[in-house]
Amino acid sequence: MIEAEATVERRQPQTREAAEQPTPVKVKKIGHVVFYVSDIERSAKFWTEIMGFRISDRNEHGMVFFRYAGDHHTIALAPAKEKTPVAKDGQVAFHHCALEVGSVAELFKIRDFLRAKGITIIYEGRRGPGGNPGVEFLDPDGFKIELYAAMDQVGWDGKSRPPEQWQRATTLEEAVASPLPGVKY
């Protein structure tokens, strides 16, 4: 038996340096990543049997949502269609990256800030699985970015919100005016 002792220097957490121009975008964490896949069932098997994720939900578009801990989903898969972007080497492409912000109130400020900067909002509101209000836009290279808040958490019983409670909303205002059961923004 080998015994080892390690000393780890504890450092103070670093704070984010202020941008040259203030921004209301303050990311708490990378929330989830969505991939286009060529075979949804093969990929679902990989993410569950190899990577250890659990399926939270499937939606009517064939998407599969996976969780690793409490968030409703941290990985999601979308079936590739004819017009799905494809990388130069023929691989199926990235769908989007989602970043969590602190609150729905912050989302309103972020949306207004993005618009003032001339960035087109391609989606805002609340989709189905996960119940999280969000704002989506493209980065300069055309990658879809989602900023969101208040994602559903999956409890110890492993059950997520039933589909009949998903209540989609097409604006942030609508999402706040009609919160999901048990949610206060």
Where are these regions (language model features)?
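Conserved short beta-strand elements that form part of the metal-binding/catalytic scaffold
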Residues: 4-10, 54-91, 138, 144-151
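Amphipathic alpha-helical segments
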Residues: 39-54, 113-116
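Long, hydrophobic/aromatic N-terminal blocks
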Residues: 15-40, 46
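Vicinal oxygen chelate
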Residues: 1-23, 29-38, 86-113, 117-185
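Short N-terminal helix-initiation segments at or just after the protein's N-terminus
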Residues: 5-10, 35-46, 78-87, 173-181
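Short phosphate-engaging motifs
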Residues: 42, 73, 106
